[in-house]
A protein has these predicted regions:
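Extreme N-terminal signal-anchor transmembrane helix of membrane signaling/transducer proteins, especially
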Residues: 3-42, 46
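Extracytoplasmic/periplasmic ligand-binding sensor regions of membrane-associated signaling proteins
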Residues: 39, 106, 121-194, 249
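Extracytoplasmic/periplasmic sensory segments of membrane signal-transduction proteins
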Residues: 46-149
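Solvent-exposed, extracytoplasmic
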Residues: 90-105, 178-221
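Amphipathic coiled-coil signal-relay and dimerization helices
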Residues: 113-126, 165-169, 210-217, 260-261
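Hydrophobic alpha-helical segments, especially N-terminal targeting/anchoring helices
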Residues: 114-115, 158, 206
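Extracellular/periplasmic juxtamembrane segments that couple receptor/chemosensory ectodomains to their
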Residues: 177, 219-220, 224-268
């Protein structure tokens, strides 16, 4: 015997609450997953920001060492000049100071030189040093305009050897004397030997113009491609279109990555 229509309606009404209970459970589970995912993403973002801050602090320490080498060199050089040291005495002192500067900065390959009495004295003399028009060099002009402050140039191609270099320099505006360090790619390699990255993490160090100075990546790619990739990231950061709050990019291997960055006091 078939149940009456009223019985069917009562059974149907009993099934409705069960459906809504099931729906509520599903929604609760989805909201829980969404909330968990948001928490994980936020934790990942905070960790990325902390790492960027930590790496920037390490860069600042290296920058401080370079500044100290230049500042101390300038102070001692001016003291020697005030004591009327001869050119030979100045050159002997500078040779010793350059050796100590190399030890302090962790690499014998750092090119150190000075300008005294219109002459360049170098730790590793290059061809044409006696006729090199340093007064017209952008690094000298930039340092001269800084009125004795230490400057860091952007990366450029050295006229002496055709290699990429960053020059750290200070010039005494009265005498025109200068103390100079040239940082080549291997110097940045040495200073980052202890870099500890998270698994699959990538690290890029750029100058103020976005030129790549050092990198460590978990994938294989041509250096020129990496350089262009990083320049584009820097362009977006400077334009304000790439921020840490929502930055998500595809790297050269096709992997999705978050982007975290800090700018150091010298513009790196």
């Amino acid at each position: 015997m078939r149940p009456s229509k009223s019985a069917e309606r009562r059974a149907s009404r009993r099934g409705v609450p069960a459906f809504f209970v099931l729906l509520a459970l599903v929604l609760t589970a989805l909201l829980g997953l969404w909330g968990t995912q948001n928490i994980l993403l936020e934790n990942s973002r905070l960790m990325g920001q902390d790492l960027a801050q930590s790496y920037a602090a390490d860069e600042e320490k290296s920058i401080a060492v370079y500044r100290t080498v230049i500042d101390m060199g300038m102070a001692y050089l001016q003291e020697q000049i005030a004591d009327e040291a001869s050119t030979d005495e100045l050159e002997a002192w500078l040779t010793d100071y350059f050796a100590k500067a190399a030890a302090a900065t962790g690499g014998e390959s750092i090119a150190s030189y000075a300008v005294i009495n219109g002459k360049i004295v170098a730790s590793d003399p290059f061809d044409g040093i006696d006729t090199y028009p340093y007064q017209n060099a952008p690094w000298y002009q930039q340092a001269l305009a800084a009125q004795g402050e230490v400057i860091f140039t952007n990366a450029y191609t050295s006229a002496a050897n055709g290699r990429q270099v960053v020059t750290v320099c200070a010039v005494d505006p009265q005498s025109g004397s200068a103390i100079v360090l040239d940082l080549f790619p291997e110097n940045f390699e040495i200073s980052h030997q202890g870099l500890d990255l998270p698994e699959d993490g990538a690290y890029y160090l750029c100058d103020a113009s976005g030129t790549l100075l050092y990198y460590s990546v978990p994938f294989s790619a041509d250096e020129s491609a990496i350089s262009l990739h990083v320049q584009e990231l820097c362009r977006q950061i400077d334009a304000g279109t790439l921020t840490e709050d929502d930055a998500s990019i595809l790297d050269l291997s096709g992997a999705t990555r978050g982007v975290y960055y800090r700018r150091t006091g010298n513009g790196w």
